[in-house]
Amino acid sequence: MPLPPRMQALPARVPRRGVLLAAAALAGWGAGRPVLALPARTLVFPRDRGTHPAFRTEWWYITGHASTEADKRAFGFQLTFFRSRVDATQGMASKFAAKQLLFAHAALTDVQGKKLWHDQRIARGGFGIATASESDMDVKLRDWSLKAEGHQYIAELPSSDFGLKLGFEETQDVLLQGKQGLSRKGPKDKQASYYYSQPQLAARGSLRLKGQDFAVSGKAWLDHEWSEEILHPDAAGWDWIGMNLTDGSALTAFRLRTRDGGTLWDGGSFRSPKGGLYTFSRGEVIFKPVRYWKSPLTQTTYPVEWIVRTPADFYTVRAVIDNQELDSRQSTGAIYWEGLSELIDSNGKRVGMGYLEMTGYAQPLRM
């Protein structure tokens, strides 16, 4: 089905938060509707693995690293499904009204080839083309899908140059971010989301790259988040990491940056191998850049190596490949960096792998 004219300009891939920011402008979010603080509530599973169409924004996000058995060829992968509520059409009775928009993107980092591959899908909800179940995680967008089956998740995202066909099995309990799943994202109470993670997923399946199939296994991380508020108006961008540690621990850390490079808000969590959870308070996470990389395409400079101070340890976060940037100036205007990175502890030992996301370095994000 052809995309509506205003949607034709969406890029092949934008970061999960960037997609939602773009959709805010395209779909007319916040059209006269006040945004209220989210109440604390108990998340119920499997229901809360499904969609929450009454909320403006939602995403299901899986990142991970995997390698082949024989030659240990390494890959990073990412798959994300987004849903956005279109406020302007909620009162329309027509079944053709686009009340929900679904986006999806997939990315594959070929470490050996030092290249990032990516693709995307977009459609309005319904008509069997784009669907999301409310009873459990079951999201479909044309030929792409992500579905929960008990304690497993199955993802199939074929594309022209690459593809993902992976299964993910839970090895740990769900991790409720923030205060029992209510995660603050700014100084105001309304700047919050319902947010849980499923770290340390055992990943197994196949990756396809330029017609060649690779049987792989590794570790993955799942995030599921939904909210009404998008971004504080003073925030220019953010830095975020989600890391699976080799000992079974899980680390989340983020900060929202102001236009002068200061920290507007920060947070995250650390869960030990035995399940002990420490949720970081504001001011306990500090991102300090160590090494920079300048994009030859956009001339944007990114910190591709960081010292990230948390109550758990002082970590070094280092990009596996420097060039994991996407330039979408011809569409949403966003230029950002997101990709596979390694985690090194204060003793200089590599203790984990995961994903680093950085936005707002080329220019501040626009609402």
Model-identified regions with their sequence ranges:
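N-terminal secretory signal peptides
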Residues: 1-14, 22-28
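Structured soluble/peripheral alpha/beta segments that form catalytic or ligand/cofactor-binding pockets
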Residues: 3-4, 32-367
